From Swiss-Prot:
Its main location: nucleus. An active LINE-1 encodes for 2 proteins translated from a single RNA containing two non-overlapping ORFs, ORF1 and ORF2. ORF1p is described in that entry as a representative of all ORF1p potentially expressed by active elements in mouse genome. ORF2p is described in the related entry AC P11369. Homotrimer (via coiled coil domain). May also form larger homooligomers. Interacts with Tex19.1 and UBR2. Interacts with MOV10. Residues 179-274 are annotated as: RNA recognition motif (RRM) domain. Expressed in meiotic spermatocytes and in the cerebellum (at protein level). GO terms for cellular component: cytoplasm; cytoplasmic ribonucleoprotein granule; cytoplasmic stress granule; nucleolus; ribonucleoprotein complex. Belongs to the transposase 22 family. This is LINE-1 retrotransposable element ORF1 protein. Residues 278-339 are annotated as: C-terminal domain (CTD). It comes from Mus musculus (Mouse). Residues 59-156 form a coiled coil. GO terms for biological process: retrotransposition. The keyword Amino-acid biosynthesis does not apply. The gene is Lire1. GO terms for molecular function: nucleotide binding; single-stranded RNA binding.
Length: 357
């Protein structure tokens, strides 16, 4: 067919199929199988163009979502910085007011002493001195009220800062939800395999060949973090793999837990979820406790963002922080003894290592 004279696929269907408005396909006859090879070339081209347009729209929507989320995160960070500056300025004002109050009190004390001296000498109190004392007392009262108001404002700003920090943490964790963090891969492997993406594919082939057969390993982004290589850093930088969705990431993490030990070229490595720095710090605080509980078959699990879940005597308990966990230990002497002995053993080894430094 000549270029520019392509028939409309819709008109073609109207010419050759009276019931084209129905969506039910005609069952293929034995002699003419209904395959994509027998479709009209123009219809195939039209369908492929539609698929490409859908892909482009999807990627554009995803990019727009990431850009809007990044802008929102930047705005929250700027608001947090402004709040921190206000808190610092108010703290400075409080210090200045407190210094002024101390000066006034000192002046008042000196004036009182002067009045007492004059009273002893003359037996009378000068009216101007009484007015001065009254003025000082009023200034002190006003300064104390100002300090109280500023203290209230500082507390409110501190609370607002904490809420903003938590919101930023949630946004960062949401953006990182499809991510995987790979720990223990030497930097030189990037040059040998031409990038972290190929390293990840190599890990999947080596440890989880069935997963690669069952689902496509589509990687949106792969990079080392932090971006700049620090020559003084002893360990290699972590690799971040951004998958197409969180379901693929969760399936890989489940396979990692079931396998127990993941390797790369025979060497052990670690694959973990990717969280914000604040969330990672909170989760690391449970490391020693989880290791001890796992050794005593207490089935510990770390829930998002940093909650400890344990199963004892068939009952599952969840602790949001170490304070709650410590309170529970006071009601469970056996578990408290296990945790205490482990801590004492670790502290003893640390004390033995001190003279070697």
């Amino acid at each position: 067919m000549a270029k520019g004279k392509r028939k409309n696929p819709t008109n073609r269907n109207q010419d050759h199929s009276p019931s084209s408005e129905r969506s039910t396909p005609t069952p293929p006859s034995p002699g003419h199988p209904n395959t994509t090879e027998n479709l009209d070339p123009d219809l195939k081209t039209f369908l492929m163009m539609m698929i490409e347009d859908i892909k482009k729209d999807f990627h554009k929507s995803l990019k727009d979502l990431q850009e809007s989320t990044a802008k929102e995160l930047q705005a929250l960070k700027e608001k947090q910085e402004n709040t921190a500056k206000q808190v610092m300025e108010m703290n400075k004002t409080i210090l200045e007011l407190k210094g002024e109050v101390d000066t006034i009190k000192k002046t008042q004390s000196e004036a009182t002493l002067e009045i007492e001296t004059l009273g002893k000498r003359s037996g009378t109190i000068d009216a101007s001195i009484s007015n001065r004392i009254q003025e000082m007392e009023e200034r002190i009262s006003g300064a104390e009220d100002s300090i109280e108001n500023i203290d209230t404002t500082v507390k409110e700003n501190t609370k607002c800062k904490r809420i903003l920090t938590q919101n930023i943490q949630v946004i960062q964790d949401t953006m990182r939800r499809p991510n995987l963090r790979i720990i223990g891969i030497d930097e030189n492997e990037d040059f040998q395999l031409k990038g972290p993406a190929n390293i990840f594919n190599k890990i999947i082939e080596e440890n989880f060949p069935n997963i690669k057969k069952e689902m496509p390993m589509i990687i949106q982004e792969a990079y080392r973090t932090p971006n700049r290589l620090d020559q003084k850093r002893n360990s290699s930088r972590h690799i971040i793999i951004r998958t197409t969705n969180a379901l693929n990431k969760d399936r890989i993490l489940k396979a990692v837990r079931e396998k127990g030990q993941v390797t790369y070229k025979g060497r052990p490595i670690r694959i973990t979820p990717d969280f914000s720095p604040e969330t990672m710090k909170a989760r690391r605080a449970w490391t020693d406790v989880i290791q001890t509980l796992r050794e005593h078959k207490c089935q510990p699990r770390l829930l998002y963002p940093a909650k400890l879940s344990i199963t004892i005597d068939g009952e599952t308990k969840v602790f949001h922080d170490k304070t709650k966990f410590t309170q529970y230990l006071s009601t469970n002497p056996a578990l408290q003894r296990i945790i205490t002995e482990k801590k004492q053993y670790k502290d003893g080894n640390h004390a033995l290592e001190q003279p070697r430094k």
